[in-house]
Swiss-Prot record:
Protein name: Protein PsiE
InterPro entries, alphabetized: P_starv_induced_PsiE, P_starv_induced_PsiE-like
Naturally occurring in which organism (per UniProt): Salmonella typhimurium (strain LT2 / SGSC1412 / ATCC 700720)
Lineage, top ranks: Bacteria, Pseudomonadati, Pseudomonadota, Gammaproteobacteria, Enterobacterales
Triggers of expression: Expression is under the control of the two-component regulatory system PhoQ/PhoP.
Source taxon at top rank: Bacteria
HAMAP family: PsiE
Record flagged with keyword RNA-binding: no
């Protein structure tokens, strides 16, 4: 097999980058549709008289924020020169674990472990935002 020239490698990288960008754009549009559906679901849960609907409302709010954070991550990717900032993934991780605590809080040990994971992610976020590691 012959080695590829530098211009061909750059062409391949450009094609793959464009496929990635198109995929992320499509994912962003799908997430916007899901965000709209979640808005309708939240409105239904808000005006439902049952007590169980209040738990659905809280769970739906956290899911809403997850959609919102993923859309913000995609927007940030395109605005920052095709780069995913690490701290946005940490924000999404924290929100996902909070949702897990709200939805699945069966044993105190699980809640304690989830809380420790959140603490670890907050420490990671603090380190990422410190002057030594800050890129922006």
């Amino acid at each position: 097999m012959m080695p590829l020239s530098r211009s061909r490698l750059e062409f391949i990288a450009t094609i793959l980058q464009n496929v990635l960008n198109l995929g992320l754009l499509t994912l962003g549009l799908i997430l916007v549709v899901f965000l709209g559906k979640e808005t309708v679901h939240l409105a239904d849960a808000l005006f439902a008289p049952e007590q169980a609907s209040k738990y659905e409302l809280v769970e739906g709010l956290v899911i809403y924020f997850l959609y919102f954070e993923f859309i913000a991550l995609i927007v940030k990717y395109f605005k920052s020169g095709l780069h995913f900032p690490l701290r946005y993934f940490v924000y999404i991780g924290i929100t996902a674990i909070v949702r897990l605590i709200i939805v699945d809080h069966k044993t105190p040990m699980d809640v304690l472990l989830y809380s420790a994971a959140i603490l670890l992610l907050v420490i990671t976020l603090w380190l990422c935002n410190s002057n030594r590691l800050r890129r922006e």
